[in-house]
Amino acid sequence: MLRISNFLPMGVVCATLLAGSPISGKSLAVQALRLTNQPVNIASLGNGNYQFCSQPDPQDWRDGAGVCFNFTKTGNQVNGYYGYPHSDQFICVRGIVDSDRITGEGLSMVWDIPQKHPPDSAEFKWDAEEHLTLSQANILNTVNVDEDSATWILYRKASLNLEGFYQYNRPRMTPVIQLCQWNSK
């Protein structure tokens, strides 16, 4: 009987540890989710690749929720694109970051702009959420592909406000280098 009583306290300890494992694992996952969904000051980030979106990480198959900015940061310089995940609606943005605002230039590709309607150089809000303001548009290049034409438009003035955006744990959208090739325009 003495031998069994020695195992009883050890069994209780093991049962307690095993029962607590799923709870502590779950709390770690919830804690990690909270950290990913906290607004972050972009200027304070180290050099690297990032993705910020206007809505928290959907935790499903989607690459992002709301409107997103996928970018590379080096010092106070950023190079990336701002747009809607799973769509062809995006604008390349590069510039200087100050707190949660990027000030610099924008680049877009537009299909089939009528010759009589060149881009307007006046300031306008690009997105429905009104985070990206563009102005001073210039046509850089027009390329004809079969019967369609693609026009590259440079916006000499771009201002992107990312206040309140959420940092995702890793970039999941298309890499910046595949969409924003500033030198080839």
Over which residues does each language-model region extend?
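Tryptophan-anchored aromatic micro-motifs
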Residues: 31-64
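Bacterial N-terminal signal peptides that target proteins for export
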Residues: 1-12
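Signal peptide processing junction and immediate N-terminal pro/mature segment
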Residues: 22-32
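Beta-sheet ligand-binding and adhesion/scaffold domains
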Residues: 101-185
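Bacterial N-terminal signal peptides
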Residues: 10-21
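Sequence contexts marking disulfide-bonded cysteines in secreted/extracellular proteins
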Residues: 52-54, 67-69, 93, 179-181
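Short, hydrophobic/aromatic-rich segments at coil-to-beta transitions
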Residues: 44-52, 75-81, 102
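N-terminal glycine/threonine-rich, aromatic-flanked beta-hairpin/loop signature
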Residues: 60-94
